[in-house]
């Protein structure tokens, strides 16, 4: 079982332009994400998929493996599917390029189901929230997920799900962490499908899988790694990195 981490990276971003090259204490954001991915115990290879020559040049200088992709990809998963056609692998991880603090243990958690007797079509991570954490539950930028009794996703939404009409103290709300692992064939099938109705309504690419009958296994983690989507996120990550430096 050969696992490969693919990191989609584009230069333009709707909320924070050129964030992949943003400086994080002397190193570009995308380079820090790549270095964290290299620490995975289960993945044998890490590759960055980009349509930007500028990003590719920065990564080449660090010794990273890069695959150039088309600028027409509608989402990160389509970008890595294009790259995966040129790479030998049984399982491919889609690790967002804006995750410079990603825990290698979280990457391995997403991969572990594929080393079992009954590997899923796709796996992803979820983080339990307190029922009274209304800020995260109601934030449309924090995606929520509901699962069946076996831990497979029923639905992902930017809305608060489950709706809290009769919320019990024992009810757990789960936030989705956008790290995915796909079997090689499911990844290519995803890319061959057109964007789905619910995917476009919620702007959540994983709904394309659910609408087409694929099953997504959700693995619970207690480790939350802040990504970078806004200027405020960028400053928060800089503070975290700064506080971890010696001296």
Swiss-Prot record:
Cellular component per GO, a single term: cytosol
Gene that produces this protein: kdsB
Name of the protein: 3-deoxy-manno-octulosonate cytidylyltransferase
Function, in words: Activates KDO (a required 8-carbon sugar) for incorporation into bacterial lipopolysaccharide in Gram-negative bacteria.
Family: Belongs to the KdsB family.
E.C. code: 2.7.7.38
Domain of life: Bacteria
Gene3D superfamilies reported in the protein's UniProt record: Spore Coat Polysaccharide Biosynthesis Protein SpsA, Chain A
Species assigned in the record: Pelodictyon phaeoclathratiforme (strain DSM 5477 / BU-1)
